[in-house]
């Protein structure tokens, strides 16, 4: 029997799967060591850590294996999902800040001013859960983000929107199915009145009018 180094090494399916999981876990670990600071010029204000963890848990609890998830302008929430390394979910980050391309193919450059650009055919009409925080507190921003949602969603898509309460009238105009949740997101550096709303009933998020 030849012991040449040119001989092919064939791994069993179990060994190959374990090796792939190892490399993926190492990739996740390296990506999550990359700290990205807020850029206020891009209207970036990270949530309190507990808020990011809570929302990520909501997404994980209220989706099922194989679901496609989009975090739209919510990189701090995406980071928690990514760190949790839930391989059952297809998590994607839509974000303007190209520093987040550290996440590789899961990063999708997103400019709300061009809400229909750069969306892959694989994601159009195929997203099960969208978590979003429009980058600016304006009607224009809500209107354009709503166009992006329309391209991504299907009839059963769950939406979770986090923003300033001042946007509620605009949200009702462009996303009329949304309901105000009991849960309130927190930002350590902002004093604005923040809230969240969803288009589905969530035991974890609650409903404001049922306090």
From Swiss-Prot:
- One of the GO biological process terms: methylation
Question: A Gene Ontology molecular-function term?
Answer: protein-lysine N-methyltransferase activity
| EC numbers | 2.1.1.-
Q: Recite the UniProt keywords alphabetically.
A: Cytoplasm, Methyltransferase, Transferase
Record HAMAP family: Methyltr_EFM5
Q: What does this protein do?
A: S-adenosyl-L-methionine-dependent protein-lysine N-methyltransferase that methylates elongation factor 1-alpha.
Record protein name field: Protein-lysine N-methyltransferase DDB_G0272708
């Amino acid at each position: 029997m030849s012991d040449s180094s040119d001989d092919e090494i064939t791994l069993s399916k179990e060994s190959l799967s374990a090796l792939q999981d190892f490399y993926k876990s190492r990739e996740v670990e390296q990506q999550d060591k990359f700290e990205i600071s807020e850029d206020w010029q891009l209207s970036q204000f990270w949530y309190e850590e507990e808020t990011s963890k809570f929302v990520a848990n909501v997404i994980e609890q209220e989706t099922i294996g194989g679901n496609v998830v989009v975090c739209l302008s919510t990189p701090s929430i995406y980071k928690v999902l990514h760190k949790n390394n839930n391989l059952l979910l297809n998590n994607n980050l839509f974000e303007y800040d190209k520093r987040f391309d550290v996440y590789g193919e899961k990063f999708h450059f997103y400019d709300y001013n061009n809400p229909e650009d750069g969306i892959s055919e694989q994601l159009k009409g195929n997203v099960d859960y969208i978590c979003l925080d429009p980058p600016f507190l304006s009607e224009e921003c809500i209107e354009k983000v709503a166009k992006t949602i329309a391209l991504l969603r299907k009839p059963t898509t769950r939406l979770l929107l986090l923003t300033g309460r001042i946007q509620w009238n605009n949200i009702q105009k462009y996303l009329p199915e949304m309901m105000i949740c009991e849960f309130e997101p927190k930002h350590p550096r902002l004093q604005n009145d923040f809230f969240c709303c969803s288009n589905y009933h969530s035991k974890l998020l609650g409903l404001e009018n049922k306090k």
